[in-house]
Amino acid sequence: MCSLPMARYYIIKYADQKALYTRDGQLLVGDPVADNCCAEKICILPNRGLARTKVPIFLGIQGGSRCLACVETEEGPSLQLEDVNIEELYKGGEEATRFTFFQSSSGSAFRLEAAAWPGWFLCGPAEPQQPVQLTKESEPSARTKFYFEQSW
């Protein structure tokens, strides 16, 4: 678990109350009970190297030992989990933009924009039990809205 006092843990849910969970090294959206697993507790820490007005955050899983990152692929930007400790990102141990998401509120939900690719947002898949993705979007949609439930 992340030992920094400002770390907050959340269960992040998608529009229809499906939660984020991990399986086979991927961050998926689905019903953890039906899929026989547990919702992932996501550790969130701020990226102090970017303007606070945009609410830059890191998303860590497995106690903060792995982080969600944006990578360039032939098809465009994509998401992957990397073995990078969230505390090291917070302390500024390396270039961290690709691990950073700008958190903006949309009513009671939040949208997460990739700092490395402006205009690209974390989105839920069209089908359950599929990985979270990035999508280019100008207007908010249900697929890019996530709900944060604090977890202890």
Swiss-Prot record:
<dbReference type="InterPro" id="IPR000975">
    <property type="entry name" value="IL-1_fam"/>
</dbReference>
<dbReference type="InterPro" id="IPR003297">
    <property type="entry name" value="IL-1RA/IL-36"/>
</dbReference>
<comment type="function">
    <text>Cytokine with immunomodulatory activity. Alone, does not induce cytokine production, but reduces IL22 and IL17A production by T-cells in response to heat-killed Candida albicans. Reduces IL36G-induced production of IL8 by peripheral blood mononuclear cells. Increases IL6 production by dendritic cells stimulated by bacterial lipopolysaccharides (LPS). Ligand for IL-36R/IL1RL2.</text>
</comment>
<protein>
    <recommendedName>
        <fullName>Interleukin-1 family member 10</fullName>
    </recommendedName>
</protein>
<dbReference type="GO" id="GO:0071222">
    <property type="term" value="P:cellular response to lipopolysaccharide"/>
</dbReference>
<keyword id="KW-0963">Cytoplasm</keyword>
<dbReference type="GO" id="GO:0005149">
    <property type="term" value="F:interleukin-1 receptor binding"/>
</dbReference>
<keyword id="KW-0202">Cytokine</keyword>
<dbReference type="InterPro" id="IPR008996">
    <property type="entry name" value="IL1/FGF"/>
</dbReference>
<dbReference type="GO" id="GO:0006954">
    <property type="term" value="P:inflammatory response"/>
</dbReference>
<dbReference type="GO" id="GO:0005737">
    <property type="term" value="C:cytoplasm"/>
</dbReference>
<dbReference type="GO" id="GO:0005615">
    <property type="term" value="C:extracellular space"/>
</dbReference>
<dbReference type="GO" id="GO:0005125">
    <property type="term" value="F:cytokine activity"/>
</dbReference>
<keyword id="KW-0964">Secreted</keyword>
<comment type="similarity">
    <text>Belongs to the IL-1 family.</text>
</comment>
<dbReference type="GO" id="GO:0019221">
    <property type="term" value="P:cytokine-mediated signaling pathway"/>
</dbReference>
<dbReference type="Pfam" id="PF00340">
    <property type="entry name" value="IL1"/>
</dbReference>
<comment type="subunit">
    <text>Interacts with cargo receptor TMED10; the interaction mediates the translocation from the cytoplasm into the ERGIC (endoplasmic reticulum-Golgi intermediate compartment) and thereby secretion.</text>
</comment>
<dbReference type="GO" id="GO:0005576">
    <property type="term" value="C:extracellular region"/>
</dbReference>
<dbReference type="GO" id="GO:0006955">
    <property type="term" value="P:immune response"/>
</dbReference>
